[in-house]
Amino acid sequence: MAAKEVRFGDSARQAVISGVNVLADAVKVTLGPKGRNVVLERSYGAPTITKDGVSVAKEIELKDKFENMGAQMVKEVASKTSDTAGDGTTTATVLAQSIVKEGMRYVAAGMNPMDLKRGIEKAVTGAVEELKKLSKPCSTSKEIAQVGSISANSDTEIGRIIAEAMDKVGKEGVITVEDGSGLENELDVVEGMQFDRGYLSPYFVSSADKQIAALESPFVLLHDKKISNIRDLLPVLEQVAKAGKPLLIIAEDVDGEALATLVVNNIRGILKTCAVKAPGFGDRRKAMLEDIAILTGGTVIAEEVGLSLEKTRLEDLGQAKRIEVGKENTTIIDGAGDVKTIEARVAQIRKQIEEASSDYDREKLQERVAKLAGGVALIKVGAATEVEMKEKKARVEDALHATRAAVEEGIVPGGGVALLRTINAVSKIKGDNHDQDSGIKIVLRAMEEPLRQIVTNCGDEASVVVNKVKEGQGTFGYNAATGEYGDLVAMGVLDPTKVTRSALQNAASVAGLILTTDAMVAELPKEDSPGAGAGMGGMGGMGGMDM
């Protein structure tokens, strides 16, 4: 086991503060509309330019192991805030640095760190309650666009395109971000349910120019097994032919004479059909077939529920207004399923999302919700160079997270004002002793810090602005982008409540742990053995080896 170095008390705390300051100082230059960029070196390719706090934090690794521990603790604040709210990472870092800095002064003065921590926790609980009172629902498209713009560093174009995407696919819809091919941002929307399986034979194509099979008001047959024998299919094909409607078959696979017969019937115009493989694999395939059945008002023909292909009736088939089948995708538009049944299915999948343990499962379940509840929107980010593309894409993703958070928990005035407005309520909270009161004071001071940093990044005098904003009430604040004072909500400077709340809670949580640290243990750096660094000429460099 390698030898360890142990530091205690003030020596340990000083190292932690140094690490916290290095990371926080690098991150906080990005805060606000006039925040600066940070350039991150890459071992290959062009460097990355970013204004995203968590991206900067993740890059920082310090040589001194004790300082590095401090930096890693604050990195955790940024990462946790990014995971829960998707934005607010820089605010969280600024808050954590302030709480640690102020707190260490009180610890050095001889106060009890545990009581300071309890005071900090009381203040944060009070501030969160006050934030909830300040919060108002984010419902209009205009507000969604404003939240998106602020999160994307005052880029109104990004805010607009996100609001448009949410309008099209609903608040539950999936919005994905991809690299575009031009200079402009583009929005593609897929309405209805789309899954990544295309036609099994090009002979099903009905529109030669678009290369798709378009079925108007079709029946949908869902089967969880492979279909090879045409005899199994004949009864249902005859019923569909009598009804005079097209048929889409979704099964594990369709091949052999079954596929050949369907193709021949299609070419001759006897019965318009199309066959596709069921999406997904294993249990996920069963679940997705069930989703399609609920969406189209049909039933999955499966042996385990006592249904067979030969005995299938028209009532077992699903229906839709239109289905388009391409080479790689199938889109079901306006399925005939019962709205209440669809809502119940969505609620059931949401419950599974809450219980899902892996991010992959959660993502796949979220996609299923979107396909049932809304649709899928694709934002294609346009840029002139790859470096700009990466930076812009990261901002779009940030803005997307922020707008989702705003829809979830509402919005508060932005620009660091929401935290300032909680100061009155928090200052009335009393601790159990003098040290706890000091803990509350630490948070009161920290809650000014985001606004101070925004103003500092603009090149203005922070104390003057903070005092002027404190004199105002409600949504009155400082718009750093224009340098004006006024009603921030009217100006469109908004923050999601969830982002502000998460930033404060996560910052206080980690800062509290740092303040109550009294000993640190780290591995001693390995010393090079003598002679190991010498040249290899005549094997002289091997002097450190035992022969």
Curated annotation (Swiss-Prot):
Together with its co-chaperonin GroES, plays an essential role in assisting protein folding. The GroEL-GroES system forms a nano-cage that allows encapsulation of the non-native substrate proteins and provides a physical environment optimized to promote and accelerate protein folding. Forms a cylinder of 14 subunits composed of two heptameric rings stacked back-to-back. Interacts with the co-chaperonin GroES. Keywords: ATP-binding, Chaperone, Cytoplasm, Isomerase, Nucleotide-binding. It catalyses: ATP + H2O + a folded polypeptide = ADP + phosphate + an unfolded polypeptide. It comes from Nitrosomonas europaea (strain ATCC 19718 / CIP 103999 / KCTC 2705 / NBRC 14298). One of its GO terms (cellular component) is cytoplasm. One of its GO terms (biological process) is protein refolding. This is Chaperonin GroEL. GO terms for molecular function: ATP binding; ATP-dependent protein folding chaperone; isomerase activity; unfolded protein binding. Its main location: cytoplasm. It holds the Pfam family Cpn60_TCP1. ATP binds at residues 30-33, 51, 87-91, 415, 479-481, 495. Residues 525-547 are annotated as: Disordered. It is found in: Cytoplasm. Its EC number is 5.6.1.7. Belongs to the chaperonin (HSP60) family.
